[in-house]
Amino acid sequence: MTAIAPTKLNRQQILGFWAAWSGWTLDGMDSVIYALVLSPALKELLPQSGMANGPADIAFAGSILFALFLMGWGLSFLWGPIADRFGRTKCLAASILIFSVFTGAAALSQNVWELALFRFLAGIGIGGEWAMAGTYVAEAWPEDRRKQGAGYL
Protein backbone atom coordinates (compact mmCIF):
# COMPACT_ATOMS: atom_id res chain seq x y z
CA MET A 1 0.00 0.00 0.00
CA THR A 2 1.23 3.47 -0.81
CA ALA A 3 0.53 6.55 1.23
CA ILE A 4 -1.09 9.48 -0.49
CA ALA A 5 1.07 12.57 -0.30
CA PRO A 6 -0.70 15.64 1.08
CA THR A 7 -1.56 18.33 -1.41
CA LYS A 8 1.11 21.01 -1.71
CA LEU A 9 0.18 24.49 -0.58
CA ASN A 10 0.71 27.34 -3.00
CA ARG A 11 2.23 30.72 -2.15
CA GLN A 12 -1.16 32.42 -1.70
CA GLN A 13 -2.39 29.75 0.73
CA ILE A 14 0.79 29.99 2.80
CA LEU A 15 0.72 33.81 2.88
CA GLY A 16 -2.97 33.78 3.76
CA PHE A 17 -2.31 31.44 6.65
CA TRP A 18 0.51 33.62 7.99
CA ALA A 19 -1.66 36.74 7.68
CA ALA A 20 -4.43 35.06 9.68
CA TRP A 21 -1.96 33.70 12.24
CA SER A 22 -0.28 37.11 12.59
CA GLY A 23 -3.65 38.76 13.13
CA TRP A 24 -4.58 36.31 15.88
CA THR A 25 -1.14 36.73 17.46
CA LEU A 26 -1.48 40.52 17.47
CA ASP A 27 -4.92 40.12 19.05
CA GLY A 28 -3.42 38.12 21.89
CA MET A 29 -0.53 40.54 22.31
CA ASP A 30 -3.00 43.44 22.45
CA SER A 31 -4.94 41.75 25.23
CA VAL A 32 -1.82 41.25 27.34
CA ILE A 33 -0.51 44.79 26.82
CA TYR A 34 -3.95 46.29 27.43
CA ALA A 35 -4.25 44.42 30.73
CA LEU A 36 -0.84 45.71 31.81
CA VAL A 37 -1.41 49.38 30.96
CA LEU A 38 -5.12 49.78 31.73
CA SER A 39 -4.83 50.75 35.40
CA PRO A 40 -2.02 53.32 34.95
CA ALA A 41 -3.74 54.74 31.87
CA LEU A 42 -7.07 55.14 33.64
CA LYS A 43 -5.33 56.74 36.61
CA GLU A 44 -4.31 59.55 34.23
CA LEU A 45 -7.31 59.61 31.87
CA LEU A 46 -10.14 59.62 34.41
CA PRO A 47 -9.24 63.01 35.97
CA GLN A 48 -8.86 64.47 32.46
CA SER A 49 -12.43 63.31 31.83
CA GLY A 50 -13.72 64.92 35.03
CA MET A 51 -13.94 61.67 37.02
CA ALA A 52 -12.37 60.40 40.21
CA ASN A 53 -9.48 57.96 39.85
CA GLY A 54 -9.72 55.82 42.97
CA PRO A 55 -9.35 52.03 42.79
CA ALA A 56 -13.12 51.46 42.56
CA ASP A 57 -13.43 54.11 39.84
CA ILE A 58 -10.62 52.53 37.84
CA ALA A 59 -12.19 49.08 38.20
CA PHE A 60 -15.59 50.38 37.11
CA ALA A 61 -14.21 52.31 34.12
CA GLY A 62 -12.07 49.32 33.13
CA SER A 63 -15.14 47.08 33.21
CA ILE A 64 -17.09 49.50 31.03
CA LEU A 65 -14.20 49.74 28.55
CA PHE A 66 -13.95 45.95 28.36
CA ALA A 67 -17.71 45.67 27.85
CA LEU A 68 -17.55 48.19 25.00
CA PHE A 69 -14.69 46.24 23.44
CA LEU A 70 -16.74 43.03 23.65
CA MET A 71 -19.76 44.81 22.16
CA GLY A 72 -17.62 45.79 19.17
CA TRP A 73 -16.36 42.22 18.95
CA GLY A 74 -19.96 41.03 19.12
CA LEU A 75 -20.64 42.81 15.84
CA SER A 76 -18.47 40.23 14.08
CA PHE A 77 -21.58 38.75 12.46
CA LEU A 78 -21.64 41.82 10.19
CA TRP A 79 -18.38 40.77 8.57
CA GLY A 80 -19.83 37.59 7.03
CA PRO A 81 -22.09 39.27 4.45
CA ILE A 82 -19.43 41.90 3.78
CA ALA A 83 -16.84 39.17 3.14
CA ASP A 84 -19.28 37.30 0.89
CA ARG A 85 -19.68 40.43 -1.21
CA PHE A 86 -16.11 41.76 -1.32
CA GLY A 87 -14.02 38.65 -0.65
CA ARG A 88 -12.45 37.14 2.44
CA THR A 89 -8.92 38.30 1.69
CA LYS A 90 -9.85 41.97 1.36
CA CYS A 91 -12.11 41.88 4.40
CA LEU A 92 -9.57 40.02 6.51
CA ALA A 93 -6.98 42.66 5.63
CA ALA A 94 -9.50 45.43 6.35
CA SER A 95 -10.41 43.97 9.75
CA ILE A 96 -6.74 43.66 10.74
CA LEU A 97 -6.17 47.25 9.58
CA ILE A 98 -9.19 48.52 11.56
CA PHE A 99 -8.03 46.66 14.65
CA SER A 100 -4.46 47.93 14.30
CA VAL A 101 -5.36 51.56 13.57
CA PHE A 102 -7.79 51.89 16.45
CA THR A 103 -5.53 50.04 18.88
CA GLY A 104 -2.82 52.56 17.98
CA ALA A 105 -5.31 55.42 18.32
CA ALA A 106 -6.27 54.14 21.78
CA ALA A 107 -2.67 54.66 22.86
CA LEU A 108 -3.02 58.33 21.93
CA SER A 109 -6.32 58.88 23.76
CA GLN A 110 -6.58 62.18 25.61
CA ASN A 111 -9.52 61.15 27.79
CA VAL A 112 -11.52 58.08 28.76
CA TRP A 113 -14.22 58.82 26.16
CA GLU A 114 -11.73 58.65 23.30
CA LEU A 115 -10.32 55.45 24.76
CA ALA A 116 -13.82 53.96 24.95
CA LEU A 117 -14.56 54.85 21.31
CA PHE A 118 -11.24 53.52 20.03
CA ARG A 119 -11.55 50.27 21.99
CA PHE A 120 -15.09 49.75 20.65
CA LEU A 121 -13.87 50.28 17.07
CA ALA A 122 -10.85 48.02 17.68
CA GLY A 123 -13.33 45.40 18.91
CA ILE A 124 -15.15 45.59 15.58
CA GLY A 125 -11.85 44.93 13.81
CA ILE A 126 -10.84 42.06 16.07
CA GLY A 127 -14.29 40.50 15.74
CA GLY A 128 -13.96 40.48 11.97
CA GLU A 129 -10.47 39.08 12.14
CA TRP A 130 -11.45 36.23 14.43
CA ALA A 131 -14.51 35.43 12.34
CA MET A 132 -12.74 35.46 8.99
CA ALA A 133 -9.27 34.06 9.73
CA GLY A 134 -10.40 30.51 10.39
CA THR A 135 -12.93 30.64 7.57
CA TYR A 136 -10.30 31.93 5.17
CA VAL A 137 -7.88 29.12 5.99
CA ALA A 138 -10.66 26.52 5.77
CA GLU A 139 -11.74 27.79 2.35
CA ALA A 140 -8.29 28.47 0.90
CA TRP A 141 -6.49 25.30 1.93
CA PRO A 142 -7.01 21.99 0.11
CA GLU A 143 -9.56 19.68 1.70
CA ASP A 144 -6.95 17.15 2.83
CA ARG A 145 -4.98 19.89 4.67
CA ARG A 146 -7.81 21.92 6.28
CA LYS A 147 -7.68 20.18 9.65
CA GLN A 148 -3.94 20.71 9.75
CA GLY A 149 -4.35 24.41 8.89
CA ALA A 150 -7.01 24.86 11.56
CA GLY A 151 -4.77 23.11 14.08
CA TYR A 152 -1.81 25.34 13.25
CA LEU A 153 -3.99 28.42 13.47
Language-model segments: residues:
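Transmembrane-helix signature of 12-pass secondary carriers
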Residues: 1-153
